[in-house]
A protein has these predicted regions:
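Gly/Ser/Thr-rich loops at beta-strand to alpha-helix junctions
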Residues: 11-17, 61-63, 77-79, 107-112, ...
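Short, charged, surface-exposed secondary-structure boundary motifs
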Residues: 19-22, 40-45, 80-88
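A basic- and aromatic-enriched beta-loop-alpha substructure that forms the phosphate/nucleotide-
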Residues: 56-109
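N-terminal small/polar loop signature for handling phosphorylated ligands or for N-terminal nucleophile
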Residues: 32-67
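Internal, active-site/partner-interface "lid" segment
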Residues: 97-155
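Short, charged N-terminal beta->alpha structural module
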Residues: 5-42
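Short, acidic/turn-prone active-site loops that include or flank metal/cofactor-
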Residues: 36-39, 75-79, 219-221
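Gly/His-enriched, cation/cofactor- and phosphate-binding structural elements
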Residues: 2-10, 69, 94-97, 155-252
């Protein structure tokens, strides 16, 4: 397959997606970037799709049939066993990742534990996490609301930490609470569990994953979440009420 015919479609922005875009542009690849958020859909790029070129969709939900020549790049949900997206793109193009790109890959693949495992320094971890939050669009107000959420809305059930978030940007909360074994963060329109046996928990909700109402990633002990605005508040409350006893009774 001719690498020069690839047309890259960028998904929701975070530090990894920014890094992918930078790497592609440095290598003079054709990139389409609509600066989408998490949960980005292939249909956003309908205006560029055709049956001649090979399109590479990066972390895009396939809400429409993909074009005739299409490569899907992702490492979430059913693709959670794969390398990070930036690593997959590097392999596709025969590019060797530098230290910064390796840190970005580890962060996106397995959060802080994966960076620690690859030998990242505390300063490198702090830098990557700050840049990732910024790339996600987290504002100073979000950071302050995260602190307020922890200060005023944190509770525990056995070894489970539960936070009622005042900001939809949950990573501003997770970064402040790390290290943790089991963390559940929720708001009026979304919910995410981080920690022990997250992939196994996701397995109990596969019908929601298949309907794109839920997602998971980050390995066995990564995360499982309900997509923002994917269900009614009372439905979300029911899932939270089901999750808490499950999570508090997890065995190691």
């Amino acid at each position: 397959m001719n690498r020069n015919r690839y047309r890259f479609l960028l998904g929701g922005h975070d530090l990894e997606m920014n890094g992918i875009g930078k790497m592609l542009r440095q290598n003079r690849k054709i990139v389409y970037d609509l600066h989408l958020s998490w949960g980005a859909r292939l249909s956003s790029y309908t205006y560029v799709l055709n049956s001649e070129d090979t399109f590479v969709g990066i972390e895009l939900t396939e809400d429409i049939p993909p074009p005739a020549h299409y490569i899907a790049i992702d490492h979430h949900n059913e693709n959670s066993h794969k390398a990070s997206s930036i690593e997959q793109i590097a392999e596709l193009l025969g590019i060797k990742l530098n230290r910064e790109q390796q840190l970005i890959a580890a962060n996106d693949r397995g959060y802080i534990p994966a960076m620690i495992e690859m030998g990242a320094t505390p300063d490198e971890i702090t830098d990557i996490r700050c840049r990732d939050r910024e790339a996600q669009g987290i504002t100073e107000e979000d950071e302050l609301l995260a602190e307020q959420s922890i200060r005023e809305n944190l509770s525990t059930e056995k070894d489970l930490i539960i936070v009622n978030a005042l900001t939809p940007r949950f990573s501003a909360i997770t970064d402040r609470l790390f290290p943790f074994e089991k963390l559940l963060i929720y708001s009026n329109d979304s919910l995410t569990y981080y920690g022990r046996q997250a992939k196994a928990i996701a397995g109990l909700f596969m019908p929601l994953v298949e309907k794109h109402k839920a997602y998971y990633g980050g390995g066995e002990n990564g995360f499982f979440g309900i997509a923002q605005n994917s269900m009614l508040p009372e439905e979300l409350q029911q899932i939270k009420n089901k999750l808490i006893p499950l999570l508090t009774n997890l065995t190691k």
